[in-house]
Every structure is written in C-alpha cells, then in structure tokens.
C-alpha cells in the first residue's frame, strides 16, 4: 500500500515516519514539506538515518493523488482543510491530524477556533478517529480525523463512567499536564530552553479548544449535552500527558465494581492498560511508562467523603495522542491487524 505524508517535518510528522518505515504492509511513496522541500528527510529527522532515503517534496496534489493510496495530513490547523477537500474529491483515503475535521457542528469552529469552516459539508463525512469509540465507522470511512492529544487521553478515562450512568454530566473537570513536544517545532519566547525548563505553566486555563471535542464525543455517549471544564498545564517533560479527570458520582460505587466496569468496557482494546497496584510507587497511570508506545494507561481513585471519582489517564502525546492513533486508524481502514506497526514496548528509563 502506497502512503504519502503531507507536512512531515514537525514532531508529529517525524513520529509518523518512524512508525511507517517499520510497518510491514505499507511503503512511503511521498513526503512533503513547504519549508524543507528538497532536503533529505534524515537531515530534519536524524533518528531516521538509514531507514528512509527520501527527500521532502514540494506540495504537488496531482503527483500525491496519483502515487498514493492513502495520505496523512499533518499540517497546522486551518491549513489542512483545502488539501483534504482536494484529496477527498479525488477518492483518496485521508487521515488528518489537524483539528479541521474533528468537530461536527460548523458553528463549533467559530466558537473554539475563531474561523468559519470552508467545507462544512465534509464534517458529516469525517469520522472522529478514536477506535475505542468509532471502530466500525472508521472501517468504512474515507476521511478520518485524529483526535486532539489531551482530548483522547481524557475521553478514554471518562467514557465507561458515562456509558454506565455513574457520574453527573454537568460538572466534569479535566486537568491535563503535557510535555513540550505538544507545542510543536515552531519556537516562541515561551518555548526557549531557559523559559521552558522547570516550568509548571498553565495555558488556556479556560475554553481550551480540546474541550469542544470532549463535550462532543461524551455527548454522543450520553445522548445529551455534556459540560466539561478543562485546564491544561505545560510541564517539564518532552513527551507525555497525564490527565486527572474529576467527576462526581450519582451514587457511591465500590472499587471492585468500578474495575469490572472498566475492564468490561475495554476488554478487547489492545492499547488500553489498567494501572492498579496497592503497593509500591506505581499505583496510578504515569506518562513516564508509556513513552514511545500507543498505550493509554487508565486508573482511578474514589473520594467517598465528596462522592468524587478521580479518573486518571496517561499517554504519549506524539503516539496515542497523534501518530500512533493515526497508524491505528490506518490499520482499521485498510483491514490490517490493529497492532501492525505499533508493537512497541514503552521506552524506559527516559
């Protein structure tokens, strides 16, 4: 299967290439970059030296469509939609890693992103790319939109709680900690080492755009409107997300019952792991132990005094939060084994 990657010079694009070069059933045919056109890929992504000998191509839609069976688009929000529309009209399968097709209501793009969607007719044809939510739709879809990294980490932890009507849906609080790679390769004053090192920095503490995705997807599960308050923080790691999801129980449930619910909900999911250890240091999910993998680790604790259930989830923002999910979606779309190209144990220590 011939694969193309549009916008492959960033962190997510590099991670996509890392996974694709080892995938047993695909061949990378074309890799594009506006800024790095005609440079060797391994000069921008030195870790890929010896694995890929391509140069970045300038964008050529005709060549891309004629030489690739499936295309990943990994360009900034607001720039992907025209590329995706052109490829879609040509019948090419697309996996988009921008936010341009995640939300189903065109009005939500005005609310969360501040711009009017130029192709609202495509929103209903796009599938939100979380296999744990939409596997059957992904199988049949021509266009899959990968989720936001913090959104998917939170969604996986909360979904079973709503499915089983365990929590109040008008008061969910999502607290996310994310590493510096989540900011991408474009530098600014806050991303320089002297300013970034050692921080625990709140950013967009209200109305973060991933809130829209979480409300949309949990609303589909609940079949009603969901209210989510989300506050992300930049922390002193390179890769990884830890999400602490504060939810409030409708009635007290014991720990054993809750574990059964989680395990039954995700018993057939290859990339969901449960962290539950009464002893030792590793009692709860920790992003340190998912780095380089497509796993999302899930755990919880119950605050009986306040009828509060704290659902915790950890992932690698470049893997389950981006490139790993993209490859998982590709495997489903093409009928491959879901773990093809993703059978990596996490790297440790990192």
Where in this protein do the model-derived segments appear?
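Short secondary-structure transition/capping segments
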Residues: 12, 74-85, 145-148, 219-228, ...
């Amino acid at each position: 299967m011939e694969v193309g990657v549009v916008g492959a010079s960033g962190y997510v694009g590099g991670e996509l290439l890392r996974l694709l070069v080892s995938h047993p059933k695909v061949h990378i045919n074309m890799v594009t970059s506006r800024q790095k056109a005609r440079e060797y890929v391994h000069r921008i992504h030195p870790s890929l030296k010896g694995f890929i000998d391509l140069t970045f191509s300038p964008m050529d839609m005709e060549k891309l469509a004629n030489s690739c069976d499936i295309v990943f688009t990994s360009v900034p929000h607001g720039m992907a939609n025209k590329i995706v529309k052109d490829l879609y009209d040509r019948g090419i399968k697309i996996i988009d890693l921008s936010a341009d097709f995640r939300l189903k209501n065109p009005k939500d793009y005005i609310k969360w992103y501040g711009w009017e969607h130029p192709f609202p007719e495509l929103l209903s044809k796009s599938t939100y790319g979380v296999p744990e939510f939409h596997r059957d739709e992904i199988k049949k879809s021509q266009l899959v939109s990968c989720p936001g990294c913090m959104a998917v980490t939170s969604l996986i932890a909360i979904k079973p709680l709503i499915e089983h009507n365990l929590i109040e849906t008008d008061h969910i609080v999502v607290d996310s900690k994310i590493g510096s790679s989540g900011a991408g390769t474009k530098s600014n004053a806050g991303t320089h080492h002297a300013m970034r090192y050692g921080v625990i920095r709140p950013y967009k503490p209200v109305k973060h755009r991933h809130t829209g995705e979480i409300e949309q997807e949990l609303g589909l599960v609940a079949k009603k409107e969901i209210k989510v308050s989300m506050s992300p923080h930049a922390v002193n790691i390179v890769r990884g997300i830890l999400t602490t999801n504060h939810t409030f129980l409708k009635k007290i449930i014991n720990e054993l019952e809750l574990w059964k619910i989680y395990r039954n909900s995700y018993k057939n999911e290859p990339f969901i792991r449960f962290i539950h250890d009464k002893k030792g240091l590793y009692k709860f999910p920790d992003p340190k132990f998912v780095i380089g993998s497509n796993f999302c680790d899930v755990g919880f604790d119950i605050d009986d005094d306040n009828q509060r259930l704290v659902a915790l989830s950890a992932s690698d923002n470049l893997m389950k939060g981006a490139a790993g999910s993209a490859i998982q979606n590709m495997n489903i779309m093409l009928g491959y084994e879901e773990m093809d190209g993703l059978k990596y144990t996490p790297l440790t220590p990192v």
